[in-house]
């Protein structure tokens, strides 16, 4: 069994090379630079600035000996040509070989695939097709062939039913990857308020960390390959009626807000805790706005869940939205590395 101090604490990071130095990365096991994209059939670093950032992140391994640094492909809107390119054996092969070269050139520790999404619609207008599922499997097989056993291969999975059911051939993919990062956030709709990153589902229409984990364990995925997600940002809805403090009401998604900007919200917000979901939320009566987010208490409970369920670890999107002190990463580390 994983001992407590072997849990993964995985930070996605899309920021520049200066911002990262505000954060204490002791106890962070993986830093995933986000994102690289396809250029033709190849994995490519977008520009010189990104290249310098990656070099800086890799240099942090001197300061933090336990840190591994990965790069991620794609992201929301960042995988427009993935379905097309990965539909040919040549495209998959060239991607795998180019990935191996980038990892070697930059002294990186691995690749995280964040294709949103194989088989099912993601960004409007981006291609998806049934063949994506088998093509993804073959892509992983080829990556496994090109990379060394020291290299990490992971992928990000949607935490909602259609992705879990349709996008991935779990039986074939999971033996070849180190773990799956479940994106257990953005789980509620654009047109109704709710918890976007709850630990537990509270009604039959809500997804959660736990619902994704249950799904994967029930189809035989080992817990030692499951990483759950926390959100370092909140989601705000507007036009929310003053019923039940705004929870589960018809409304309109307005915007996201970083955890480190929550203090800028105006004074009209009252905050509440949903004991069933283990999730905080806020409601502003004057403005008819509803906020769903993760706070130190909720991420600490997610970290406790990782320990109690003996999962591989916890990841979050994204580090640059955290407060450098008394933030969410600190709360996660306090729980993961406490000797309880």
Give the ranges of each region predicted by the language model.
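Folded extracytoplasmic luminal domains of secretory or organellar precursors
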Residues: 91, 103-109, 117, 124, ...
């Amino acid at each position: 069994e994983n001992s407590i101090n072997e849990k993964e604490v995985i930070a996605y990071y899309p920021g520049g090379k200066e911002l990262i130095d505000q954060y204490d990365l002791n106890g962070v096991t993986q830093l995933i630079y986000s994102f690289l994209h396809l250029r033709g059939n190849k994995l490519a670093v977008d520009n010189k600035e990104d290249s310098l950032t990656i070099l800086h992140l890799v240099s942090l391994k001197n300061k933090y000996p336990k840190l591994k640094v990965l790069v991620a492909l794609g992201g929301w809107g960042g995988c427009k040509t993935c379905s097309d390119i990965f539909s040919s054996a040549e495209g998959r092969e060239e991607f795998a070989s180019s990935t191996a070269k980038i990892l070697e050139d930059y002294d990186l520790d691995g690749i995280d695939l964040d294709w949103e999404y194989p088989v099912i619609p993601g960004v409007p207008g981006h291609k998806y097709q049934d063949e994506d599922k088998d093509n993804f499997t073959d892509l992983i097989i080829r990556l496994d062939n090109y990379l060394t056993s020291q290299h990490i291969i992971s992928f990000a999975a949607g935490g909602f039913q259609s992705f879990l059911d349709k996008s991935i051939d779990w039986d074939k993919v999971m033996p070849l990857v180190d773990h799956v990062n479940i994106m257990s956030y953005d789980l509620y709709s654009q047109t109704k308020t709710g918890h976007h990153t709850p630990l537990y589902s509270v009604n039959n229409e809500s997804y959660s960390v736990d619902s994704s984990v249950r799904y994967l364990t029930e189809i035989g995925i080992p817990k030692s390959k499951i990483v759950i997600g926390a959100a370092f940002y909140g989601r705000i809805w507007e036009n929310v009626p003053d019923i039940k403090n705004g929870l589960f009401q018809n409304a309109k998604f307005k915007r996201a807000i970083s955890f480190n900007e929550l203090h800028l919200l105006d004074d009209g917000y009252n905050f509440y805790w949903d004991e069933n979901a283990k999730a905080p939320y806020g409601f502003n009566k004057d403005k008819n706005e509803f906020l769903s987010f993760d706070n130190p208490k909720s991420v600490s409970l997610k970290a406790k869940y990782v320990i109690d369920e003996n999962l591989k670890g916890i990841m979050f999107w994204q580090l640059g939205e955290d407060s450098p002190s008394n933030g969410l990463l600190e709360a996660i580390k306090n729980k993961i590395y406490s000797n309880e």
